[in-house]
């Protein structure tokens, strides 16, 4: 049941000093914490609650944000404006109390829109690649000295978090399509990386997804989009297109592409003229496409290609995007947020560049997604040598009868010779070391809590190889 809609007047400015106190219900989330950070950095009184503390809440506390662990109406000190996200249910005691008292209540997307739409906004939308692309654009503007404000859906070391408050003209925001709220933004430059069905809990079918992106594109003063995506090319009116495959209508193209285990290199062409060479530390064709979007945006803003290329050459990626977690006993451990079949394929293709045995460890995210895309999931692990599947992270959804993750393991095994099912996530550190071999690349895939088992697995594998001197390269797990 959704929270009752409370349309806010367009003239209501969230930065009005008379509206200076905010309380975020679910402040530890990546999107909520970013907005809380932006407001706190501007001197507004901010508080928030969540079930558990995390690195993001601790970062906010260092700014003076008051954090309440757990949800209680006692957190509504001084009748603040209350901010919630689609993850918060109407029965939440804080949200229910705020509605009962008639407090100003913002959906996160409404607050973002109220801040973003008043500025020169660059909004990055798409089913895949939003975090990396928005981070790349932000890094380019930061490197160019433009001092942008950044609201990103992931942690980035370059600005030590998921948000940055700048004094420059431009705001760069990752735009979430999961609940349809992307249609609330009106960017100066809108970016769409691709369009697929990824949130069947909100959209009935792909047609609904396409219509939401069409509206977002129409609301963008300039739409920059990837013409390699069939749904983009067929259904959107694109102002500035980019392509890795030579699409004839793409103003920006990557040619003479070289993918290696340590870098990606390509010639970048603009409207038929060679701009120069681009070299990236982040790997894979998906990241080259993301970088090409950043090139297109930078050029629309008037930046010289040399400035853009220099910044992108230094960009090291966002957390949980093929993030190197460590090496133990000759095994390299990688954390990646991929949770859609297309993302899994792209990540494993990048892993294959290492020319090592690839062990893919996958935690499905949301029962509804697994059910809607089941056959695609069953066939997306072709680049892995070994596939290990753990139980689905439900994200609050009711579990179906039986184990959908076990059914997935059986289905993957119809297309793949080496599949292992682990029936309990806490058992993974006990089971996975027996699968691993020196030289392996262990890639943990998923948007849930699988990543919390990586360090424990590294410790367990270190213990296993401790009797074999010379193998453990990082024996810092006692």
Curated annotation (Swiss-Prot):
GO terms for molecular function: ATP binding; UDP-N-acetylmuramate-L-alanine ligase activity. Its EC number is 6.3.2.8. Keywords: ATP-binding, Cell cycle, Cell division, Cell shape, Cell wall biogenesis/degradation, Cytoplasm, Ligase, Nucleotide-binding, Peptidoglycan synthesis. InterPro entries: Mur-like_cat_sf, Mur_ligase_C, Mur_ligase_C_dom_sf, Mur_ligase_cen, Mur_ligase_N, MurCDEF_pg_biosynth, UDP-N-AcMur_Ala_ligase_MurC. GO terms for cellular component: cytoplasm. Pathway: Cell wall biogenesis; peptidoglycan biosynthesis. ATP binds at residues 126-132. It catalyses: UDP-N-acetyl-alpha-D-muramate + L-alanine + ATP = UDP-N-acetyl-alpha-D-muramoyl-L-alanine + ADP + phosphate + H(+). The keyword Kinase does not apply. The keyword Cytoplasm applies. One of its GO terms (biological process) is cell wall organization. Coiled coil: none annotated. It is found in: Cytoplasm. Belongs to the MurCDEF family. Cell wall formation. PANTHER family: UDP-N-ACETYLMURAMATE--L-ALANINE LIGASE (PTHR43445:SF3), UDP-N-ACETYLMURAMATE--L-ALANINE LIGASE-RELATED (PTHR43445). This is UDP-N-acetylmuramate--L-alanine ligase.
């Amino acid at each position: 049941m959704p929270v009752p809609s409370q349309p806010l007047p367009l003239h209501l400015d969230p930065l009005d000093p008379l509206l200076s106190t905010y309380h975020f219900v679910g402040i530890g989330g990546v999107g909520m914490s970013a907005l809380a950070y932006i407001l706190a950095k501007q001197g507004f009184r901010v508080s928030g609650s969540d079930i558990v503390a995390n690195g993001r809440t601790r970062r906010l506390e260092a700014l003076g944000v008051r954090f309440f662990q757990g949800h209680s109406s006692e957190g509504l000190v001084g009748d603040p404006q209350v901010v919630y996200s689609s993850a918060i249910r109407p029965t939440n005691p804080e949200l229910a109390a705020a509605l009962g008292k008639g407090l100003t209540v913002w959906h996160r997307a409404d607050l973002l829109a109220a801040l973003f739409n008043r500025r020169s906004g660059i909004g990055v939308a798409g089913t895949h690649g939003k975090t990396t692309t928005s981070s790349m654009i932000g890094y380019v503007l930061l490197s160019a000295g433009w001092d942008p404000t950044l609201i990103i859906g992931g942690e980035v070391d370059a600005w030590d978090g998921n948000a940055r408050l700048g004094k420059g003209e431009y705001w760069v925001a990752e735009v979430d399509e999961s609940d349809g709220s992307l249609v609330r933004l009106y960017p100066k430059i809108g970016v769409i990386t691709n369009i697929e069905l990824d949130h069947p809990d909100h959209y009935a079918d792909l047609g609904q997804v396409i219509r939401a992106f069409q509206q977002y594109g129409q609301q963008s003063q300039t739409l920059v989009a990837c013409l390699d995506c069939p749904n983009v090319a067929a259904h959107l009116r694109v102002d500035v297109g980019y392509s890795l495959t030579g699409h004839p209508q793409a103003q920006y193209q990557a040619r003479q592409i070289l993918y290696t285990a340590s870098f990606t290199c390509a010639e970048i062409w603009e409207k038929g003229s060679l701009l120069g060479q681009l070299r990236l530390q982040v790997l894979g064709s998906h990241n080259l496409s993301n970088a090409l979007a950043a090139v297109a945006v930078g050029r629309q803003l008037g930046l010289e290609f040399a400035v853009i290329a220099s910044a992108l050459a230094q960009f090291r990626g966002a957390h949980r995007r093929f993030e190197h977690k460590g090496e133990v006993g000759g095994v390299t451990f990688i954390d990646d947020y991929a949770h859609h079949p297309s993302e899994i394929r792209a990540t494993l293709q990048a892993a294959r560049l290492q020319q090592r045995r690839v062990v893919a460890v996958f935690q499905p995210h949301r029962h509804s997604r697994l059910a809607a895309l089941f056959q695609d999931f069953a066939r997306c692990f072709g680049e892995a040598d070994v596939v290990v599947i753990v139980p689905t992270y439900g994200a609050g959804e009711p579990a179906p009868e039986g184990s959908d993750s076990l059914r997935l393991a059986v289905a993957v095994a119809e297309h793949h010779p080496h599949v292992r099912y682990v029936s309990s996530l806490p058992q993974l550190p006990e089971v996975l070391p027996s699968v691993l071999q020196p030289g392996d690349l262990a890639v943990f895939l998923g948007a849930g809590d699988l990543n919390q088992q990586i360090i424990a697995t590294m410790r367990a594998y270190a213990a296993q190889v401790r009797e074999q001197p010379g193998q453990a390269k990082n024996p810092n797990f006692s």
